A protein has these predicted regions:
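A late C-terminal transmembrane helix in Major Facilitator Superfamily
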Residues: 114, 183-222
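Helix-loop-helix hairpin linking two adjacent transmembrane segments in secondary transporters
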Residues: 1-30
């Protein structure tokens, strides 16, 4: 009733409200866990150390493992965000302007399942598994949860909604693991740099992939079979995470902090 602009305005207003709760520094907060207080105190005791220059970061295999992982998988999330309305229109003749229920359900599932992904990592860690095993088993599970999107052409609409919701939630859980890998392999003074560097790679990959998606769909539309273009694209989406997992595992057989001699 208020137009699409109202969605952005509402989100912005809620964002400013949320900022109010973050104006106070953590050490001044009255609501704080003992573990958090101890971590903050320890961080303040650590001596400041110069970060690794960006150009030197590129010499480390740990850096390239994260760069390649995000280059391959970040684009899939942006595909899910941008192209799904067009997919439902092409595949089912669904008019998203009349009802956005499928998309609402998908993103609601993403929200819930992304949180559950963190419980898996915590569960494995509580069993006494090594960091390497916890991270890689979790990433493998999340990667496998995206694989079913390869077969969307064989599913009915609501099965596709469930599959895409699972895939989106798995991506968010995957991303959380990838972000954490930066702090697993680099000292805290370098985490921001490696996160920014790998994030840049992810966005470059996203631009290239969305452009390729557009050209692919246009070509198949010209052949009179626009929905078949999506079949190919979903095959790429479903295999990207497993490919990224294999590449990461080959580059980083064991997840460890960068050794002093490597710095």
């Amino acid at each position: 009733a208020w137009g699409w602009q109202s969605a952005f305005i509402a989100a912005g207003v809620l964002g400013f409200i949320w900022v109010i709760f973050w104006l106070r520094m953590p050490k001044n907060s009255r609501v704080k866990l003992a573990e958090e207080s101890a971590a903050l105190a320890q961080a303040e005791k650590e001596e400041a150390r110069a970060s690794i220059p960006w150009r030197k970061l590129l010499a480390y295999r740990q850096s390239w493992s994260l760069i390649l992982v995000r280059f391959l998988t970040d684009p899939i999330w942006w595909f899910f965000l941008f192209w799904l309305p067009d997919f439902f229109s092409k595949h089912f003749g669904y008019n998203i302007k009349e009802s956005a229920l499928p998309l609402i359900v998908i993103y609601a599932l993403v929200t819930v399942l992304s949180i559950l992904g963190g419980t898996l990592t915590k569960f494995l860690a509580n069993r006494g598994w090594s960091l390497n095993k916890v991270r890689k088993i979790s990433m493998l599970v999340f990667a496998c949860c995206v694989v079913p999107v390869i077969f969307v052409q064989y599913f009915d609409m609501w099965t596709i909604v469930a599959v895409l919701g699972l895939a989106g939630g798995a991506h968010q859980a995957w991303s959380a693991s990838v972000y954490t890998l930066g702090s697993d392999m680099f000292p805290k003074s370098d985490v921001a740099s490696i996160t920014g560097l790998s994030g840049m790679a992810g966005q470059i990959g996203s631009v290239l992939f969305q452009t390729a998606v557009g050209f692919t769909l246009s070509w198949f539309a010209a052949q009179g079979n626009a929905s078949h273009g999506y079949d190919i694209i979903f095959m790429v989406c479903g295999s990207a995470y497993l490919a990224a997992f294999v590449i990461f595992s080959l580059i980083i057989p064991n997840i460890n902090m960068v050794a002093p001699r490597e710095r």
